[in-house]
């Protein structure tokens, strides 16, 4: 039996997640910032996902930021905390 203990770095996707993502990997893969039809379909899908996540979290869709991975998400959280702290006169993050 194989034991995989590095789930903090990479975790296998569940079959449910793979099945949910297949339409986007196969057909809706465009750059959502593009003006062409493939990009616009991707933008529509991204906007719908943002709306769904916002409803689940009880916030506005404009407050949802999707990132490409853990490091980018960590950096975004630190930058947001620093900016919010700065507004309150706090100059350090510990």
Predicted regions and their residues:
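Pyridoxal 5′-phosphate
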Residues: 1-94
């Amino acid at each position: 039996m194989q034991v995989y203990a590095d789930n903090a770095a990479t975790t296998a996707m569940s079959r449910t997640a793979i099945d949910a993502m297949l339409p986007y990997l196969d057909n809706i893969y465009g750059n959502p910032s593009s003006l062409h039809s493939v990009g616009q379909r991707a933008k529509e899908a991204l906007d719908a996902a943002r709306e769904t996540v916002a409803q689940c979290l009880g916030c506005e869709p404009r407050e949802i930021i999707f990132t490409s991975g853990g490091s980018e998400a960590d950096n975004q959280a630190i930058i947001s905390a620093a900016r919010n702290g700065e507004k309150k006169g706090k100059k350090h993050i510990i």
